[in-house]
Every structure is written in C-alpha cells, then in structure tokens.
Amino acid sequence: MSSQLKLLNIACVGSGVIGAGWIARFIENGINVNIFAPGPNAELSVNRTLENAEVAYAELTTIPRRKKGKIGFKKSIADTVKNVGLVIESVPERVAIKQKVYAEIEQHCDKSTLITSSTSGIMPSELQEKLKFPDRFYVGHPFNPVYLLPLVEIVGGEFTSEKTISLAKSVYERIGMYPIVVKKEIEAFVADRLLEAIWRESLWLIKDGICTTAELDDIVRFGFGLR
C-alpha cells in the first residue's frame, strides 16, 4: 500500500477526551480510524463524542461535508496499527507507559508509519529515545475539543526528520487543522505556556479585587479573544 493511501487510514491508541476527539476529527474528514481502547465503556465514550461532533458541525455549517471515514475497534495494538499511515498515542501522561506502547506499535507497524503523541508537555526527545526508528516520531499537541479547534502544535525531537514534520503538516491540513511547527523543544510547548501566564495574572486580578471572574471572562470573549 502506498504512503498516500496509508494516510487515509490511521490508528488511535487510547480513547479518552483527546483520543476520542482525534477519532471524531478524522472520521468527519473522511479518514478511516482503527481504535485500540481496552478500557471499560470505550466504545460508548467514543460514540458519544462522535455524536457531539455531528451536532457541532451541523450547527456550524450547512455546506455538504465529506463522506465520513470508517471506524473499527480492535482487540490488540497489532491489529490496530496494521496498514496505517499514522498512529496517534493518547494514553496517560507517564513516560514509561508511553514508551511501552511505542515498543508494541513499532513491533507491528510498517517502517514508514508515522508515530505521534498527543502529550501536552512531555519532550519528544524523551519519548522517542527508545524507538528503533525515532526519525518518524513527533508530538502533535491538539486542543479540546479536538474535533472543533483547528490548532495543533507539531514538535519534533532530537531525531525527528524534516520529512516526518512535512508529512505531519499535510495530514493535519487535510483534516482542516492549522498546524504550527514549534522550532525548539520546550516544556508545555507554546500555547499552554501562554494560557498559564494568563491564568496566573487572572488569579492576581481576582485576588486583589480588580475584577470578577465573570468580568474577566467577558474581557477575553469580547476583547482579544476575538482577534
């Protein structure tokens, strides 16, 4: 199967809030998704997210949408990552857990398959250090709800190739996202660092009685949040 055809088929390992959001985003844009989510009620959770995405898209636009991709729940990582162009890992934020998952992914996926993590802050160089082919690994950090918010931060590690970054950008653009390549590794990347700065300042403003939480919310919603 060619690389371009394989990128019409992706795999998601993990189906929490972010994982399910990725699934909905790809399905709604005509990409087939294999899912490995061994936790209880995983299918119910994913289907609920798909329903939420359907409602949201229907309210946002009346333009005819793409034919939806197919969804398949698999019983093993081996079956999940077979013949796909991209594997998205969205498991708990622990390096050891993620690296164990990557080892199993690499054991069963093609050498050309891209592997990405949805981590919100772990450095990609640390995550990729035990991979056999670390050049195909990167971080793709989205924002919740993934099926609505277009921004995704692409962060390469020490061994990530330029080809991998370029392919990742094309995948996200294909599903209507706005990828930003972070030029250097930094903890928490860029967007969350900005949010943290706003959060810290907001706490001080409220504590000192400068404004209320409702007023702060209005300042963001009706001011710079609209830019």
Residue ranges and their predicted role:
Residues 1-56:
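NAD(P)+-binding Rossmann beta1-loop-alpha1 motif at the extreme N-terminus of oxidoreductases
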Residues 13, 36, 74, 90, ...:
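Structural motif
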Residues 40-41, 57-114, 122:
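Rossmann-like NAD(P)-binding element
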Residues 44-52, 97, 163-174, 215-218, ...:
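A non-catalytic, amphipathic alpha-helix used as a structural packing/dimerization or gating element
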Residues 117-184, 188:
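Rossmann-fold dinucleotide-binding core
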Residues 185-227:
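Helical "substrate-binding/catalytic lid" subdomain
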